[in-house]
Design a protein with these regions (language model features):
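Catalytic cores of nucleotide-sugar-dependent glycosyltransferases that transfer UDP/GDP/TDP-activated
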Residues: 1-373, 380-382, 389-392
Length: 392
């Protein structure tokens, strides 16, 4: 199958540091190539992939301080993908809804994975304007606020099976927080929980420009407390050890989380999770197996002992059963195949030398003059309810 993957140019594929969407695009591309598909990736020029790379900018836009507006780069990327669209059987978009107006006439050879929150009221109006666009959610909770869009599947994220090795005996003795420092991620809750249960907390997280004031005013003063260590943003090489050595991952979010990639990254390391019941969390965490889902800081403090007692071998086993990139890729291939079957034209009649009489001017003229039809000419099909012509 000839497949185009269109990724956000904000980060490289895979990202150097933080970037959940770009990671998933990378895992999907690599698995598709490994399975023998012809894959083209539209992404930033500093991306690394086994697929054919079509660069849409020199480097990831987040790393280029000269970039003040990302929209021109998205427009250029959509134009390039549209001009090349005939080369592909399927175009798989991971860029929200930017491409909808451009690819509307090609809707059935596109699919769009929604990676972000979908509870914003204006999105309902947008999807109502593009009812033909096939969409994929990454959790059922993500799509729950929407009515009307054309969902063709739900595909939870997956990781390469051997990306993160399990650590069956956590050596670090600390709790971990991994992700972004932002109001909705509630690292302040993680600090409160760790302090209450008397365990060290290590925080590996990035701070976006938009959240710098929040970090400076609200979070930085909390980092001076005993047992709290802020590491900053880490890369994939450091992630395995950071999560594997942790006794548990804290995920105290306060927003409608579409999936929560860090949850399955921790599970791949054998590390259990303590997560707040928001968004897709209950779909990802198997209660009492890979972690515990709680409603409040107080409940989290009470449950920490149960989380630490979970079997890390079983946590890893459940990851392998539910959240591998191979499973994710098979799910997407099933969706591609279903879309292509719908897009394929109706099968033509069995090959024959016969023609429809009135479609050839010379034959039609002969009929008008009373000239008999040859045997390899079929009279036009009668309209419904009219008698069919009989051969004598």
């Amino acid at each position: 199958m000839r497949i185009a993957q269109i990724a956000p140019p904000i980060e490289s594929v895979p990202p150097r540091l933080y970037g959940g969407t770009e990671r998933i695009v990378s895992y999907l591309c690599e698995e598709l190539v490994a399975q023998g598909h012809d894959v083209t990736l539209f992404a930033s020029g500093d991306s690394e992939t086994s697929a054919r790379l079509v660069p849409v900018c020199r480097q990831a836009l987040r790393l280029d301080r000269s970039v003040k507006d990302i929209i021109p780069y998205y427009i250029l990327m959509m134009d390039k993908a549209h001009r090349m669209a005939a080369e592909f059987d399927i175009l798989h978009f991971h860029i929200d809804q930017f491409h909808f107006p451009v690819f509307r006439e090609l809707a059935n050879k596109t699919v769009t994975t929604l990676h972000g929150r979908q509870d914003l009221p204006d999105l309902q109006k947008l999807y109502a304007g593009f009812p033909e666009m096939p969409l994929v959610s990454i959790s059922l909770a993500q799509r729950a606020p929407l009515t009307g869009p054309r969902f063709v599947g739900n595909v939870p994220h997956g990781l390469p099976r051997d990306l993160l090795a399990p650590t069956l005996n956590a050596r670090g003795g600390y709790l971990a927080f991994l992700g972004r420092i932002a109001p909705e991620k509630r690292v302040d809750r993680a600090i409160e929980i760790a302090r209450a249960v008397g365990l060290p907390l290590k925080i590996a997280a990035k701070v976006d420009r938009v959240d710098e004031e929040y970090f400076r005013d609200k979070i930085e003063p909390l980092l001076a407390q005993p047992g709290i260590e802020y590491i900053g943003e880490i890369d994939d090489c450091a992630k395995g050890r950071f999560l594997g050595d942790a006794r548990a991952l804290l995920f105290p979010i306060d927003w409608p989380e579409p999936f929560g990639l860090v949850l399955i990254e921790a599970m791949a390391c054998g590390t259990p999770v303590l997560a707040f019941n928001r968004g897709a969390v209950r779909e990802v965490v198997d209660q009492g197996v890979t972690g515990f889902v709680v409603e409040s800081v107080g409940e989290a403090i009470c449950k920490i002992g149960s989380v630490l007692a979970l079997d890390r071998c079983q946590v890893r086993r459940r990851f392998e059963e539910r959240f591998t990139a191979t499973r994710m890729t098979h799910d997407y291939l099933d969706i591609y195949a279903a879309l292509l079957e719908r897009e394929a034209p109706a099968k033509p009649p069995r090959a024959s030398t016969r023609v429809i009489a009135d479609s050839v001017p010379e034959i039609a003229a002969g009929r008008a003059a009373g000239v008999g039809l040859r045997e390899n000419v079929v009279p036009p099909v009668a309209a419904a309810g009219e008698p069919q012509a009989r051969s004598s």
